[in-house]
Amino acid sequence: MHRKELLNLLARYRSRFMEEEAFVRRAIEFVNQHEKIFDRETPVHVTGSAWVVSPDREQVLLMHHRKLNQWFQPGGHADGDADILRVALRECAEETGLEPSHIRLIDSMIFDVDIHTTPPMGNTPLHEHIDIRFVVEIDDWLPIPGNDESHAVEWFPLYQVLRYNNNRSTYRMLEKTRGIRNFHRTIPTQERHAAKALW
């Protein structure tokens, strides 16, 4: 996936949330107008994250970010990698501490798009993330070791998630999760093999 492929994904994506539609339009404009969109050194850059659900779609996996002191889905910087789906899957594996084989891609299409400001930390100034999210599935019985970027990684029932992160983008993703609750099927086998090849 490169800039053109990301543009294709964004162009095909539709949201029923007005603020997210505005994010998508801005993301398309940004990707069209800039080249170094995957580098964290730029004041605005594209990031990737994974919204993790249990197989029954009744729980969401969140990590308590050590630096930001908030609960978020796994995700992070692309660091020059233009394949934003691969970035999301890689970050999910790193931040959960799980082997990639335990992370199953539900859909290779975009699940959510968000644009948000990240506060300055250390030598890193205030900057903006254009975060491209994909939905994945992990078995909720697996031990989740996490890594040093988080204080904890925990499963939460859908009805509890907003107690820990009540921002608008979390609300959107919860609503979308409720929409796929009865769809307990991951992507077809051939696509799953293609997803594994991303690693």
What are these regions, as identified by a protein language model?
Residues 31, 38-73:
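N-terminal strand-loop-strand
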Residues 12-49, 198:
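Acidic, metal-coordinating catalytic segment for phosphate/diphosphate chemistry
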Residues 58-98, 199:
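Conserved Nudix-box catalytic region and its N-terminal flanking loop in Nudix hydrolases
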